[in-house]
Amino acid sequence: MGAAAKLAFAVFLISCSSGAILGRSETQECIFYNANWERDRTNRTGVESCYGDKDKRRHCFATWKNISGSIEIVKQGCWLDDINCYDRTDCIEKKDSPEVYFCCCEGNMCNERFSYFPEMEVTQPTSNPVTPKPPYYNILLYSLVPLMLIAGIVICAFWVYRHHKMAYPPVLVPTQDPGPPPPSPLLGLKPLQLLEVKARGRFGCVWKAQLLNEYVAVKIFPIQDKQSWQNEYEVYSLPGMKHENILQFIGAEKRGTSVDVDLWLITAFHEKGSLSDFLKANVVSWNELCHIAETMARGLAYLHEDIPGLKDGHKPAISHRDIKSKNVLLKNNLTACIADFGLALKFEAGKSAGDTHGQVGTRRYMAPEVLEGAINFQRDAFLRIDMYAMGLVLWELASRCTAADGPVDEYMLPFEEEIGQHPSLEDMQEVVVHKKKRPVLRDYWQKHAGMAMLCETIEECWDHDAEARLSAGCVGERITQMQRLTNIITTEDIVTVVTMVTNVDFPPKESSL
């Protein structure tokens, strides 16, 4: 019996360790296809590069329909870290489906071929006459059965542990307050009604919705943009992310079937919309400009700040990487809040910032070093890239301000006058990098004391030398000082203004990055 027990235990150890011994093929690229490419605003076919956290697996997937023997592909592409796809080199569906078939696999382009092989039902053999067993057979049987049961329980427990640890949760629900209070009820248990589409972007569309008796914004991502949705959720879930000048996060959910899944991100809703939309329809006074610019700068400064010792943990420094007027929302009192963290990077001590692809963001807001592909992949370099883009947003505000004694321009995006509405990467490289041009600062802006100071601040934000740029905190302090200074100036003091402007002590230019 001792030899039998040793044999069973050895078999059990081999079966448990075989998965760790076997290597797995890394998935870098998958065949891409989207039957609903027009609705989702994607390419129809092609090859998709798979990105994700280094400690997560990447897979390929395919979904299709079988209509009277005719195969109709629904979607193909990248799939992120699903335990059901582990160590599958072929894309094979084994379960029958009346609607859509789904398979996933590991390995480059492994979803190019897919198939359906139903699991064969094991038929029970017909009973045969019982032949007498020797006595030692019963001894061995009674010895092995308890050992095999124990081994089975251990294997099942290990599988459940891995499944819950590594598989992505079907519903992510944050707490309303990241501190000690218990989590809020599941959003899925509250009636959430989509009302109207308010905006469409690179990663999906934004709906105005009603949650109980309040309006909320619901950003809906298609499944192929899971990485962006997951990144936004992770950034919003960091300690200390509740701030007046950062968009309020409410929750995140998966909606739909296992195949046709939409990813929802629920945030506060602001009727005035983005700064870009507001400036298209409105001009701003000097005080309104200062309020919008100051609150925007304070939001970005808080995002950039590394704050240890909060009650719910350590808030790391975060680079937004897509600062633009479309991603600055306005509350009813024109207070600005930063939104859209799909491309954001967090810088946690002792941890990698993740996959840092250099040329990301919106072309017309890309800093010279981004356009050149000459980024220093350090925290401060990414924060300075945000500051270049902020300089362009401040220019948009200045172009629609009524403070200066001159005409107010029609709203235009940065570089729209120089390049047009749809610049290519090559266009931006030529204008920004080689010619070192920036949007025009009108001469008559300089005749207003506050606008003259603002123009100087803008130029120091979009400086070609990244290390010479201001920090967000410094910009916020400067705008506060500008508003305070101009508010005490009267028309009779116009002669004094020139002296005051030239002698004003700005906050130090050194970046606090």
Swiss-Prot record:
GO terms for molecular function: activin binding; activin receptor activity; ATP binding; BMP receptor activity; metal ion binding. It catalyses: L-threonyl-[receptor-protein] + ATP = O-phospho-L-threonyl-[receptor-protein] + ADP + H(+); L-seryl-[receptor-protein] + ATP = O-phospho-L-seryl-[receptor-protein] + ADP + H(+). One of its GO terms (cellular component) is activin receptor complex. Residues 162-513 are cytoplasmic. Residues 192-485 form the Protein kinase domain. Its cofactor is Mg(2+); Mn(2+). Keywords: ATP-binding, Cell membrane, Disulfide bond, Glycoprotein, Kinase, Magnesium, Manganese, Membrane, Metal-binding, Nucleotide-binding, Receptor, Serine/threonine-protein kinase, Signal, Transferase, Transmembrane, Transmembrane helix. The active site is at residue 322. It is an enzyme of class 2 (transferase). The keyword ATP-binding applies. It is a single-pass type I membrane protein. GO terms for biological process: activin receptor signaling pathway; BMP signaling pathway; cellular response to growth factor stimulus; pattern specification process. Its EC number is 2.7.11.30. ATP binds at residues 198-206, 219. It is found in: Cell membrane. Disulfide bonds join 30-60, 50-78, 85-104, 91-103, 105-110. Residues 1-19 form the signal peptide. Pfam families: Activin_recp, Pkinase. Belongs to the protein kinase superfamily. TKL Ser/Thr protein kinase family. TGFB receptor subfamily. On ligand binding, forms a receptor complex consisting of two type II and two type I transmembrane serine/threonine kinases. Type II receptors phosphorylate and activate type I receptors which autophosphorylate, then bind and activate SMAD transcriptional regulators. Receptor for activin A, activin B and inhibin A. Mediates induction of adipogenesis by GDF6. Part of a complex consisting of MAGI2/ARIP1, ACVR2A, ACVR1B and SMAD3. Interacts with MAGI2/ARIP1. Interacts with type I receptor ACVR1. Interacts with BMP7. Interacts with TSC22D1/TSC-22. Interacts with activin A/INHBA. This is Activin receptor type-2A. It comes from Bos taurus. The lineage of its organism: Eukaryota, Metazoa, Chordata, Craniata, Vertebrata.
